[in-house]
Amino acid sequence: MANVALLGCTGMVGSHILTHLLGNSSVARIDTISRRTPQPATAAPQEKLTTFVSDDSSKWASQLSSLTPTPDIFISAFGTTRGAAGGFENQYKIEHGLNVEMARAARDAGTKVYVLISSTGADKNSSFGYPRMKGEIEEEVKAMGFDRTIILRPGLISGERQESRPAEAVMRGFAGLVGKIHSGLKDGWAQDADVIAKAAVNAGVKALNGEVPAGSEKVWVMYGKDIIQYGKGQ
């Protein structure tokens, strides 16, 4: 039975991750750290869910470090947008800074498996800010030396977002339409948030049990086809 900590539990993918963790019989305890109370905790008491809610993100790492029992798996689906942050510089400080800080706190606490929801095209050498930020987060996390590091690189994430992203909403709508015709037409470039979430949970639990693909014993990077496999077929 796994103890899991989750960062980003109120976002598009993270909320689905929480739902799958709650429904997974291999998960004994879930700790979430967030600015807002996740919906499952507001709907009804959840026996295996403990929430820490604070607007002061400087307290998050110490909260993670103090969790008892220590999480076996730490999952980060945390991210923000340029608009919400007030520009890319602030987005970088928040998204890169908190992801790296929380990963380090998890490692130092003794967490064995780290799971990151990243993005297709993540590249620390990119000339574009967003993929460069994602790539830098990946590289810094990999260097921390968790027993297992899992990085999911989904394409366009389809589903319903709470915040407004008009251009992305058009593409999500198109992905949904194409997916209704045949799922294979969109699986290569867009994945449903729920499918990504299930893949993250399944991969994390399998990695904790030592069930990883050959050659991915330390770092397992999951692309679209892998996400579909573990999010739909497992």
From Swiss-Prot:
Alphabetically ordered keywords of this record: Membrane, Mitochondrion, Mitochondrion outer membrane, Transit peptide
Pfam families reported for this sequence: NAD_binding_10
GO biological process, one term: import into nucleus
Membrane topology reported for the UniProt record: Peripheral membrane protein
SUPFAM superfamilies for this protein: NAD(P)-binding Rossmann-fold domains
GO (cellular component) term, any one: mitochondrial outer membrane
Top-level division of the source organism's lineage: Eukaryota
Localization per record: Mitochondrion outer membrane
Segment forming the signal sequence: none
Transit peptide residue numbers: 1-36
Keyword Transit peptide part of the UniProt annotation: yes
Residues that span the membrane, as ranges: none
Protein family membership: Belongs to the FMP52 family.
Name of the molecule in the record: Protein fmp52, mitochondrial
Species of the source: Aspergillus niger (strain ATCC MYA-4892 / CBS 513.88 / FGSC A1513)
Name of encoding gene: fmp52
